[in-house]
Every structure is written in structure tokens, then in C-alpha cells.
């Protein structure tokens, strides 16, 4: 109908029907007015996306509001812009006008994909899904890499990460999960390297492999879930010792958050209940009795010389399983 009207010769413009909008507003407000005991404060708020519209927002508010008041003020309706109990909202576009009265708050942030792709190291714990979600809120399309150790841990961790990736993917779509077999690397580190360095050495290998996947897949940064000082591997010295193995940027959204805040966010996004299902993750295998808290890079490099780490990483990369999370 609108297009037909606009194609009529001699028709200079077309405007929203204030009478029709007012009738709709009355239909919505009247039941609320009755349920509130015939006393309700209301206002009209207009937003003009089409700035060419001839009336200003306050003028539209007056046109619609006065019509509604003429009908409902005898029944107890009053205008109160600052303390309105009911708000009728109008958005005027170039081709249509939308009227609504219930604005639900969204997640805000930036549109997914507008900031590029990142690759998140996803475990079965509480923290890493929250990191992934926070990066999605900043406009990143988040892909995932999981370091699997089924020979030592069974399939439980694998299935758990599939569930977590699916939950995070609800906020973005088109995420990809890369599953890396990690058992050979962990076995070599366990058998040949100093026990106290195990966890940091695991992480260095993970970062190297993740960086290579990110480069091949087109992700511009890695995302991890470290929170400074939360566990022994997350001291400044250990984070530096891990980060130095790659030139790819590493984002740590949780670095200044405490555990309570992270848990609260996990509950909000629906990942907490999955994360707390008992299941050891990759880094918990062969945990040292006294893990190093202030590792020295030369000592780590000396440990790595004891194993064919480049060949082990290349072999793991050749066996990566690629899963489209949308298909889960």
C-alpha cells in the first residue's frame, strides 16, 4: 500500500497515520490502566531514523500523546515523562514506522564478525567459555581449539567441550572447533622433562599449535582464559614464558577478574552447569607436586631440547579434527 501511494503522481510525501498509531496505543494502554486501578503515568517517545520526516520527535510525541490523553485522561491516565510507568515508543524510518511498548535489553557490544576472527583455547572449565563470550561481545567471530587427551582421560572431556562450544556458538553462529590430539606431546614431556616445568611446557606447545591453526584459518589473535595469579601457571613470569613462543597476539579477557565474577558471568551465559560436570582437563594430567611459579625461559628451552617438539607439534597438526559447530 505504501509503495502504491508513493507512486501516485502529485503525491509529495507520505507520513505515519497519527490516528492509527494513537488507536493502537489506546488498545495497549487501556488494559494496563484498568489493572493499575485507573491511575497510570505514561509518555510517548519518538526516534526519527528518517531525518527528512517533516515533524520533530517532540511534535510527534505531542500529536500521538494528546490523542491518547483525550481518550483516556478521564479514566485516570496522566503524562509524566520522567517517571512514566508506561512508555509508548515510535520509530520512524524512511519506509515504515514501528510502534512498540516493550523494549527488552540486549547483550549490546559489537556485531559478531565486525572485529575479525579469533581462536580461543577452549577447555572444559568455567573460565574459557566466558573468555570466548566476552570476545564475541567485542565483535569477534570466535573459533575454538581443544587439546584432547582421550587415551589418558577418556571421551568425557571431548563431549563436554562439544557442549560448551555449542552453547557459545548460540551467541554468534559459524564457529569452528579444532580438536588437537595432545597425548603424544604430554607423554614426551612427562617422560623426559623436569616435572616442575610440565604445565608451562604443555602451555608453550599449545600456544605454538594454536598459533599455527590461527594462521592457517585466518584468525588474527589467540584468546585464553588466564586470570592473573589464579593458579600457579598464571603468574606474570609464567604467562611471559608461554606468550613468547608465538608472535600472534594473545588476548586474555579475564586477566583482572576474580573467580567469583567469572562464575557469575558463566551462570549468566548458561555455560556454568556444563563446566562444573566433573571431568579432568588436559593440563591436569601428570600434574607436578610442586609446579614452577616463576619459570625461566632458558631452563624451559633446555627442557624442550630433550624432546622432538617440532616433530610432535607437526604430527598433532596433521591429525587435527575440524568440526563445524553449527552442525552439532
PLM ranges: what are they?
Residues 277-328:
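The feature marks non-catalytic terminal segments
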Residues 73, 166-174, 212-220, 267-271, ...:
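Generic secondary-structure signature for well-ordered alpha-helical cores
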Residues 1-119, 132-176, 244, 292-297, ...:
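RNA-binding accessory domains that recognize and position tRNA/RNA substrates
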Residues 270-278:
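A short alpha-helix-loop-beta-strand transition element characteristic
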Residues 67-68, 103-115, 182, 186, ...:
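Active-site adenylate/phosphate-handling loop in enzymes that bind or generate adenylated species
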Residues 126-127:
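Hydrophobic/small residue at the entry helix of a nucleotide-binding pocket
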Amino acid at each position: 500500500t505504501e509503495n502504491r501511494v508513493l507512486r501516485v503522481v502529485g503525491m509529495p510525501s507520505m507520513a505515519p497515520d497519527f490516528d492509527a498509531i494513537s488507536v493502537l496505543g489506546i488498545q495497549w494502554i487501556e488494559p494496563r490502566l484498568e489493572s493499575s486501578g485507573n491511575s497510570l503515568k505514561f509518555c510517548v517517545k519518538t526516534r526519527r531514523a528518517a531525518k527528512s520526516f517533516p515533524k520533530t520527535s517532540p511534535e510527534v510525541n505531542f500529536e500521538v500523546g494528546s490523542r491518547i490523553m483525550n481518550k483516556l485522561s478521564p479514566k485516570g491516565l496522566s503524562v509524566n515523562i520522567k517517571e512514566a510507568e508506561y512508555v509508548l515508543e515510535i520509530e520512524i524510518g524512511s519506509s515504515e514506522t514501528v510502534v512498540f511498548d516493550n523494549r527488552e535489553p540486549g547483550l549490546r557490544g559489537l556485531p559478531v564478525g565486525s572485529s575479525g576472527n579469533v581462536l580461543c583455547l577452549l577447555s572444559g572449565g568455567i573460565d574459557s567459555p566466558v573468555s570466548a563470550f566476552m570476545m564475541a561481545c567485542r565483535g569477534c567471530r570466535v573459533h575454538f581449539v581443544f587439546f584432547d587427551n582421550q587415551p589418558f582421560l577418556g571421551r568425557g572431556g571431548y563431549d563436554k567441550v562439544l557442549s560448551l562450544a555449542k552453547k557459545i556458538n548460540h551467541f554468534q553462529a559459524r564457529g569452528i572447533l579444532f580438536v588437537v590430539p595432545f597425548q603424544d606431546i604430554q607423554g614426551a614431556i612427562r617422560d623426559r622433562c623436569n616435572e616442575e616445568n610440565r604445565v608451562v611446557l604443555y602451555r608453550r606447545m599449545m600456544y605454538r599449535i594454536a598459533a599455527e591453526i590461527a594462521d592457517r584459518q585466518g584468525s588474527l589473535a589467540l584468546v585464553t582464559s588466564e586470570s592473573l595469579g589464579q593458579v600457579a601457571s598464571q603468574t606474570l613470569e609464567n604467562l611471559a614464558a608461554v606468550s613468547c613462543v608465538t608472535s600472534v597476539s594473545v588476548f586474555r579477557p579475564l586477566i583482572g577478574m576474580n573467580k567469583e565474577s567469572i562464575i557469575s558471568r558463566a551462570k549468566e551465559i548458561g555455560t556454568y552447569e556444563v563446566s562444573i560436570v566433573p571431568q579432568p582437563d588436559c593440563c591436569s594430567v601428570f600434574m607436578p607436586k610442586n609446579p614452577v611459579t616463576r619459570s625461566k625461559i632458558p631452563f624451559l628451552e633446555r627442557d624442550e631440547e630433550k624432546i622432538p617438539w617440532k616433530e610432535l607439534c607437526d604430527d598433532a597438526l596433521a591429525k587435527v579434527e575440524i568440526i563445524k559447530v553449527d552442525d552439532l
